[in-house]
Amino acid sequence: MATVSMRDMLQAGVHFGHQTRYWNPKMKPFIFGARNKVHIINLEKTVPMFNDALAELNKIASRKGKILFVGTKRAASEAVKEAAQNCDQFFVNHRWLGGMLTNWKTVRQSIKRLKDLEAQSQDGTFDKLTKKEALIRSRELGKLENSLGGIKDMGGLPDALFVIDAEHEHIAIKEANNLGIPVFAVVDTNSDPDGVDFIIPGNDDAIRAVKLYLGAVATAVREGRSQDLAVQAEESFVEAE
C-alpha cells in the first residue's frame, strides 16, 4: 500500500506554509510554528493524515470508484493531468467551469459536442468545410478539449475529488459538498479547511511537494484498481471451474 514518510515530505518542502500574515486561523491545529515570518506545518499531523487519505482513495478505487483530480493553477496543471492519466482517472486542470458537477446535465451535452467535433476532425468532415467554418470548429474543439477533455470519458459524477489547493478550488469543493461527494485536498496555511473531508495540511505551491502528493495518490489508486481487477479475475476463474 502506498505511503509517504516524514523524510519524503521534508525533502519536498511540504512543511513550508505561507507568510504568517496570510494565515487562516482555522489551520492553527496543523501549524508547528513560524520561521522568518513563514508558517511551518506540523508534519507529525500531515504524515498520518495523508496516509489515511491514501488508504481511503485506495479503497474507493478498489470498488471501481471514479476519482476526479482538480488543480487548475498553472504550476500544478501539467502534473495533475499526468497523475490522473497515470492511474486511468479524470482531471480538470485548466479552469473549473461553475456547475461542472452540480449542473452535470448541461456538462454532458458539452461533452457530447466535444466528441462529435473530435469525430468530425478525424473522419474528414473538416476537410469538406470552408476554411472559415473549419477554423471556427477547430477552435471550438480546442476550447472544449481544454475544459472538458479530462472528464469526457467519466460517464457520470465522480466518487471522490482529489484537490491541489483548497483555496484556489473552493468552487469545486463547494459543488462536491452539495452533492455529498467526498473531498480530499491539500490545504495550505492560508486556506479554509471547511468542506474538506480528508485534510492534507501542506505546501500547495512547491512543484516538488505537489508532485509528491500526486504521485502517491496515483499509486494508491492504481493499486486499488488492480485489487479490483484481481477480484474480477478470481471470480471469473471460479465460474469457469
Curated annotation (Swiss-Prot):
Stored Pfam families: Ribosomal_S2 (PF00318)
Keyword Ribosomal protein included in the entry's annotation: yes
GO process terms (BP): translation
GO MF annotation terms: structural constituent of ribosome
Key words of the record: Ribonucleoprotein, Ribosomal protein
Domain of life assignment: Bacteria
Disulfide bonds: none
Family matches, as PANTHER family: 30S RIBOSOMAL PROTEIN S2 PROKARYOTIC AND ORGANELLAR, SMALL RIBOSOMAL SUBUNIT PROTEIN US2M
Family from the record: Belongs to the universal ribosomal protein uS2 family.
UniProt protein name: Small ribosomal subunit protein uS2
Gene source species: Photorhabdus laumondii subsp. laumondii (strain DSM 15139 / CIP 105565 / TT01)
Gene label: rpsB
